Amino acid sequence: MAQANSRSRNSATISYPEKRRARVNLGKREVEILKTPYLLETQIESYRKFLQKDIAAEKREDNGLHAAFKSVFPITSYSGYAVLEYVGYSLGGESTLFDVEECKLRGLTYAAPLKVNMRLVIYDKEAPAGKKAIKDIKEQEVYMGEIPLMTETGSLVINGTERVVVSQLHRSPGVFFEHDKGKTHSSGKLLYSARVIPYRGSWLDFEFDPKDCLFVRIDRRRKLPATVILRALGYDTEQILDMFYKTNHFHLNQETVTLDLIPQRLRGELAVVEIKDKKGKVIVEANRRISARHIRLIEKAEINKLELPDDYLYGKVIGKTIIDKETGEIIAHANEEITAELLKNLRATKTASLDTLYINEIECGLYVSDTLRLDTTTNQLEALVEIYRIMRPGEPPTKEAAESLFENLFFSPERYSLSAVGRMKFNRRVGRKELTGLDVLSKEDIVDVLRVLVDIRDGKGDVDDIDHLGNRRIRSVGEMAENQFRVGLVRVERAVKDRLSLADVENLMPQDLVNAKPVSAAIKEFFGSSQLSQFMDQNNPLSEITHKRRVSALGPGGLTRERAGFEVRDVHVTHYGRVCPIETPEGPNIGLINSLAVFARANEYGFLETPYRKVVDRVVTDETEYLSAIEEGDYYIAQANTNVDEKGRLVDDLISCRYKGEFTLTTPDKINYMDVSPRQIVSVAAALIPFLEHDDANRALMGSNMQRQAVPTIRPETPLVGTGMERTVAVDSGVTVIAKRSGVIDSVDASRIVVRVDRKETEDDDDIGVDIYNLTKFTRSNQNTCINQHPIVEVGDKVQKGDVLADGPSTDIGELALGQNLLVAFMPWNGYNFEDSILISERLVEEDRFTTIHIQEFTCVARDTKLGPEEITSDIPNVGESALAKLDESGIVHIGAEVNAGDILVGKVTPKGETQLTPEEKLLRAIFGEKASDVKDTSLRVTPGITGTVIGVRIFTREGVKKDERTLEIEKAELSKVEKDLNDELRVREDALFENLEKLLTGRVAAGGPNKLAKGTKITKSYLADLPRQKWFEIRLQDDAATKRLEASHEHFKELRETRDAKLKDSRQKLTQGGDLAPGVIKIVKVYLAVKRRIQPGDKMAGRHGNKGVISTIVPIEDMPYLEDGTPVDIVLNPLGVPSRMNIGQVLETHLGWATKGLGKKIGEMIEKGADAKELRKSLKPIYDLSKTQRFDLEALEDPEIVTLAKNLRKGVPISSPVFDGATEEEIKQLLKMADLPTSGQAALYDGRTGKKFDRSVTVGYMYMLKLNHLVDDKMHARSTGSYSLVTQQPLGGKAQFGGQRFGEMEVWALEAYGAAYTLQEMLTVKSDDVAGRTRMYKNIVDGDHRMDAGMPESFNVLVKEIRSLAIDIGLEND
């Protein structure tokens, strides 16, 4: 499907929906170089790589399931004589028992069984040493649980609900250098640190302390001097110093020392002695600071030796250990400071020279040397023991344990992995050329990290920015599932190792070794309950798409809301074109959950990249290149709206561009790239807001979030003012039906479309070329909204591959349609639009403009209880006849019944324990023998506040339980429907087959056949018409090739019938077999109610610009303000909502909407006057000519198509004003002029109640308004009595618990302030938790006695108990 979508957009032909209603594009840029990519690619592609389902086992790449298996297998026994190897895997083919729809109905997971081919190799124990002889090899397919499959639209069905796994934005593995911003130490000194983050394994941190010593932490444990880890790696003091320092070489004379001079190293030092050239001329006086000029002079004079006094050496550090050559004893250790004493010793032992560390305050500090002095360890073993003590405190260290622990921490592939990404980032950061290498750390890696850290402390190099998108990567579904799978496999590995070491391993098969439970449990847990596996937002097509394109920084291995600071949440320069700066939730998650930008995608390493057009020598080419945030920094990148001449040359002298994350101006010859599109920086939802460029960012954020909450209306209406993204979203979301192949519509009804495919599209002769599309009718979505598809094509219409055949929820002729176009006036109206309230006309209710259908699902479960089974029946104790009127004999409500709150949907009785019966009851039971008293009524009733129509009932019965009448009736109806569908399908396919046969046979010479067909006769149509179609296959032809084709058709005919029978059998089996229900469940009944909700006061509405409000009242049409021609407005908004919010886009949209409506009206008038196609074409041309670029080709349409187009434009000519490239003020004025409307955008309005003209003209026009899924029906709630909390005996809270209203602390103060003592007492006792008092009160009200006497509130008893629990005896004194 993905391919179908992406390809269809590239076709040059005009699509079917566009012919029906084309948008006038007011964008300024030439045709898009890059079409919008398939919007669900991230999810689908990632999961495809994980499964590699249709790729042969040998050809599978090293990722996904394959990689997980390869990383854990082969598993070798402890002895090494048995090995379990992985060969390959296969996923159960298309024969998965239930398809997506059935899984949703039955509450199952849509998955395929995973079968893994494993090989057990057993080696001969008796073989001579050093030679391994294979004794036995067994290969077997092992079942390893089920792997969920992805639906075509990128979601997963888990336990019957559609879920989406959101991609995670996490810190890329690699090495990062940062400082604490001076917050750790009171002096404000910057403390630098480095952190090596692996993909999995222990973290390694290096850090400076305020005294400039280096420390290391492993997994954030207690810190150790950093040189401990270097010693553990096997380096000694001298080697460590050698790695980090250069040395100065001194020769010892009797009284002085001579330095082998490297002039550069003197820079910045004080000259201790005069420095003279060979002629004795003083170059540097004593006690002068040596500057760069002095150094040049010294170099010029070629001075390479310098005699210095002894005290120059004092305090310097020895670089190499000095040994007495005669005795072999150590005189001075490396890293020892030189003192007068030491110099004396050196001279005494006739040491000729020594090396000191070259230290310079500016560029080379003493950090490592100082750290070595702190380090108490002296050799490798001591260092290893020290690390062992930190990692395993309290355990006695042994040499072996310490060595294996350190080895396992960073150098073992099982425990530690940087991954390819981590290695690439690591090598790049420490300045290596090659980007590949081992996944584990090496000695050199650790040394390099320390070296870079020391360099940064010395002022060479910068710290990293962790919010840069080059340091954060995307982890999508496939990768996360793979990690979970690996976790499961590692658990299996331990068990397999133990079993392989058993004595009788020779008699075992791979199946006996591997237990699939841990693997399937890990996968189940991930898809079922991971923080990133979310219940899909299915409000409308946009919310689905956005949910699948979401990127979250939360979740396992990510951030937590509490810890995330401002920096992480902020918009970063690298977000440009990768992550949307606008769309993010308001509230605690702001900035942590983002949306992918329209063109963004993840590269092989998981870094986000965005496309740019290449610019070569000032000329913009059509070549596009994807750049990641890392690569982008080095280039000059121009904006998408930069001025370009016809040949693509950059025109301006100075061009605004981005370079290294800054906006700057530069000359055209420096430009390397240019943006592909102005909407490149925003997400799909933000790209749907016209005039986004005129809105304040905060309101745009609300606008993009609120579009996702729009409820699909009964009759969707596409926006008059759109952005051109509407079609893309409707097609890619998967809610519409898309033609898989081109053809002609053969038949259409409400639930099925049949397309006769063009001959050239059919793959082979066997393919008769019929595509059948079944539509989804009135199904419940995750958000209880209604999913319903209806065809937009008619019989005989030609359709191209990728065209929209049927609209889904919130789509109108293949375009996204979230709301309705309303005539809006910005004016106050009697205070009814105070503070963002909205005033609407009764016309919207009458015309059902915002009526929505919501489908509720009610479930009734009959279980086995200790006292006996629950029963679903219409025989319910103590329930009147009227309450049972809507139930059938089985106790289940009829389809089509109108039900209200409290009505019984499914009658159910539960056995209750035997109770002592009163004599009267005993007598009754003796007479009537009824069991009325030993069961209680636990029927499923309609919850309060819901009224609706029953539209469906599903019954699932446990295997082996007798089915009731209703179940059999439903099964029979379902089966006959399936049978009818299959027969229809067969008929259509057979008709096509015989049509092809007729073409084949007509005019051919026969060699004999039924009805006395003589040899040599030509076959005619009339002969075929008289012959029953079955007998056509008995005709014999003289042409061999034709005979072969006839035989092939006969085979195909038989095949069609067999397929039908097989499908029917399969369906019958699926319908009649008992469901796989949870333990203890006998029967489940699901009842679906359709609730029609009209718009009413209290509902929330919004425009697309963050202009939201609640309906305050609905005014009769005749009272609404009206225009001069008598048109009453639909909705009145408060003008004060615009200036302070700075979302001016809504005003521009209103003006442009009015103009488009006016143009539509003019076209409508022409049609009414009976204009023909020629006249219509003439009047449409100037409108479509407004498009500067991407002009719609009217000439390509035939006359009937022009008429259809014009008819569809009567409601208004839809216009697209792309984001950041939209219509200008001049164009809006021009359009208003064309529509004969005032160019001010304001008109005189008249008061509907008095008929008087308002004092000044008002801004009127058409705005697109949405009804949001915050409906007053779902929020209204009232309670008289209900359930109480167990401990406090106070009423519960919230609508879901049918709770009361909280009377809190402040409300108590209010009553106290008014002195309303009795009211207060009532609130705190009988209306709350005085148990006896409230029962008495209830009785009093029934008796008509309205007195109240308050008793002891239960909360007082709770308080007494609380105090007693503190061992303070407290009790009430009874007087």
Swiss-Prot record:
One of its GO terms (cellular component) is DNA-directed RNA polymerase complex. GO terms for biological process: DNA-templated transcription. GO terms for molecular function: DNA binding; DNA-directed RNA polymerase activity; ribonucleoside binding. It holds the Pfam family RNA_pol_Rpb2_2. Keywords: DNA-directed RNA polymerase, Nucleotidyltransferase, Transcription, Transferase. InterPro entries: DNA-dir_RNA_pol_bsu_ext_1_sf, DNA-dir_RNA_pol_bsu_external_1, DNA-dir_RNA_pol_su2, DNA-dir_RNAP_su2_dom, DNA-dir_RNAP_su2_hyb_sf, RNA_pol_bsu_bac, RNA_pol_bsu_CS, RNA_pol_bsu_protrusion. Its EC number is 2.7.7.6. It catalyses: RNA(n) + a ribonucleoside 5'-triphosphate = RNA(n+1) + diphosphate. PROSITE patterns: RNA_POL_BETA. NCBIfam families: PRK00405.1, rpoB. The RNAP catalytic core consists of 2 alpha, 1 beta, 1 beta' and 1 omega subunit. When a sigma factor is associated with the core the holoenzyme is formed, which can initiate transcription. Belongs to the RNA polymerase beta chain family. DNA-dependent RNA polymerase catalyzes the transcription of DNA into RNA using the four ribonucleoside triphosphates as substrates. This is DNA-directed RNA polymerase subunit beta. It comes from Coxiella burnetii (strain Dugway 5J108-111).
